[in-house]
Amino acid sequence: MEAPLRPAADILRRNPQHDYELVQRVGSGTYGDVYKARNVHTGELAAVKIIKLEPGDDFSLIQQEIFMVKECKHCNIVAYFGSYLSREKLWICMEYCGGGSLQDIYHVTGPLSEMQIAYVCRETLQGLAYLHTKGKMHRDIKGANILLTDHGDVKLADFGVAAKITATIAKRKSFIGTPYWMAPEVAAVEKNGGYNQLCDIWAVGITAIELGELQPPMFDLHPMRALFLMSKSNFQPPKLKDKTKWSSTFHNFVKIALTKNPKKRPTAERLLTHTFVGQPGLSRALAVELLDKVSNPDNHAPYSEGDEDDLEPHAIIRHTIRSTNRNSRAERTASEINFDKLQFEPPLRKETEARDEMGLSSEPNFILHWNPFVDGANTGRSTSKRAIPPPLPPKPRVNTYPEDSLPDEEKSSTIKRCPDLEARAPQVLRRQSSPSCVPVAETSSSIGNGDGISKLISENTEGSAQAPQLPRKKDKRDFPKPTINGLPPTPKVLMGACFSKVFDGCPLKINCATSWIHPDTKDQYIIFGTEDGIYTLNLNELHEATMEQLFPRKCTWLYVINNTLMSLSEGKTFQLYSHNLIALFEQAKKPGLAAHIQTHRFPDRILPRKFALTTKIPDTKGCHKCCIVRNPYTGHKYLCGALQSGIVLLQWYEPMQKFMLIKHFDFPLPSPLNVFEMLVIPEQEYPMVCVAISKGSDSSQVVQFETINLNSASSWFTEIGAGSQQLDSIHVTQLERDTVLVCLDKFVKIVNLQGKLKSSKKLASELSFDFRIESVVCLQDSVLAFWKHGMQGKSFKSDEVTQEISDETRVFRLLGSDRVVVLESRPTENPAAHSNLYILAGHENSY
């Protein structure tokens, strides 16, 4: 048992509220909240950071640093007032800087002028020179940690005590800091040894670029990728991008500050003699002018880079489309009447699915668990509060960045050349579990939780080992269950869902659809990507069904992850966009001007970045296809985009809640690109990208995956089409670690990663249909295949037809099957007529 925290004499034990009154919260971070406070005795303002401490935190280091920071008294360093420890919370009271951080400021004002940057750099170097003479280093110089007072004074914050506390508490957090301001010797510290205070000088150079370009170099890269590049011996220091915008003196200052060799990098005192920071006219007036630009933006010209792609030609009136609500039986089509007679299983959840359930990703006390393919068992999903965190999955034996260490034969290998992967894959015990002991890697994917496809279609159908006894299932009344506001679920039976009409007479040309549940209201929405923009439909308001425009640009692809909507939308060209769904819906509810003039209608550079609810993903211009996958071995989530002349790979970074660039590959892709799907391979960090399907090389191999190896530094792709017959594939998706569904013409095949059928005595691994399949949805133990005038379901167990709809008077099209199956139908005689929209509703797992 940990000893209780014992404050030193420098940390007051009494109630801090006897001395400070909290006025308002002004910020929050990973380790605590920052408040504007007032000293009740003197009336002086202060900034108070409140941090909750836990047993195990190294409090001796915190005590030592608090003692040291008391000695730092300089006009360019935030003054320390005192600390309190009360009820296991540490209060750190510092000087209040009313102007805010430079990062907050430039989010509103745009780039600082060269003179303003010079003034900030000079003041920063003065503060660092003082710290360095005291034998201290800051270690976290960046725009967010440089503050302005109301009078334009520059103050360094978050050093010493804050740095130590961050390092101490970080031990209990799975958080990777931002390395973009980090010196190369710090990035390579494990390889090359220690570093000294000259790392702060490098950070000043990076911050100078940040203030002029609104972000540090490599900011669009995933942090781990940036660290990797900085630690390489051939890393080149960054420069200012615009050679003509800035003076040669500024360019030279950045070059000297960013001297790669720390032994040749100047000290703070030496750099203060540089012409850039020694020029006349550097006074507080420059900072006061900057603060005035924040407070009175109307008195200053708005910042804009004139990106014509951002200008919206659409009217500013919010676009709403109402359903015609033709509900009488006489107006219903034959297929709609038959819809009521058929019931369907829930869609199968893939083990490689990236999105989180029900928008509950921010609720760590709940896990979601359902068991597919269990005869006689409840097929629905139960939500249970977990008492003990599940164990982490075993760490795969992969290199963080394997390009330099892969043997030559591995660099050029693809799936079709792989040895038997089943022998290398870790053996995972598959059984039904009590919700409180589901491993993380399995919890996030329902297939891995029970008798999934890999067990049904297994090469070893005769079980050789008896499954361990299941723990007693707790009564469902023991667990709270979130309420979802949408179409009501039917009782949890194996065949309990049907297609329900949700919209009549839709005039839009819809390209894709997905679903999302608002984490606060629990309302379920269908989100449509159309030729006229992104629209939403609230399933909790179907009595007055309306589709509301969320974003005004043509959209061809959608995916929701952690309340973030990723879209492939068109400006001048197609590009990946990221949309903050919660903020966009909140904005739509605001009365008055905000509800009609939305932030996405402003050019990106006019709207302050801090308030941008929709942002472009850098380096994705010209993207025309996308796919997302989750690696079930590591939990990492990847997004891959097909560009006109290559591929871009991004990885989801949880602390920043966004996809960040990992790699860019330049090479020609097949045209047309009929297949574009990622396949996760054991012991490979990054997925393979399947861009074509060809005929197998022998009788046992029914298909061959033509792939691009994103793990290789040189030989990325196979000779696509060389000596093999290309197949016209319709659909490829990885259901489980070694289970892939391939749809070809009239056939659906379940194969392993070598393209061989998953043989089984009890289940069919190949299903045939009497029509050319246009799209498929994999249900719990069957496949639902769609064609022009209907759909047909076939069972893996019996190879028999389970459901069938055929209506020659209607043309059907599957719009999306990501968690909710969305279907469209139009009259055959008039394909341009308004459409009806349906969803497969009734299962709890649909919500």
Swiss-Prot record:
Biased composition (Polar residues): 430-448, 457-467
Any single biological process term in GO: intracellular signal transduction
Active site positions: 140
Keywords, sorted A to Z: ATP-binding, Cytoplasm, Kinase, Nucleotide-binding, Phosphoprotein, Serine/threonine-protein kinase, Transferase
Top-level taxon: Eukaryota
Sites where the protein binds ATP: 26-34, 49
Coiled coil: none
InterPro entries listed in its UniProt record: CNH_dom, Kinase-like_dom_sf, MAPKKKK, Prot_kinase_dom, Protein_kinase_ATP_BS, STE20/SPS1-PAK
GO terms, molecular function: ATP binding; MAP kinase kinase kinase kinase activity; protein serine kinase activity; protein serine/threonine kinase activity
Basic and acidic residues bias locations: 408-423
GO cellular component: cilium; cytoplasm; cytosol; plasma membrane
Modified residues (Phosphoserine): 335, 433
Protein location: Cytoplasm
Domain Protein kinase: 20-277
Residue ranges occupied by any CNH domain in the UniProt entry: 507-820
Known EC number: 2.7.11.1
The UniProt record lists the keyword S-adenosyl-L-methionine: no
Cofactor list: Mg(2+)
Residue span of region Disordered: 378-487
Family note: Belongs to the protein kinase superfamily. STE Ser/Thr protein kinase family. STE20 subfamily.
Summary of subunit composition and partner proteins: Interacts with both SH3 domains of the adapter proteins CRK and CRKL.
Official protein name in the record: Mitogen-activated protein kinase kinase kinase kinase 5
Organismal lineage: Eukaryota, Metazoa, Chordata, Craniata, Vertebrata
Protein encoded by which gene: Map4k5
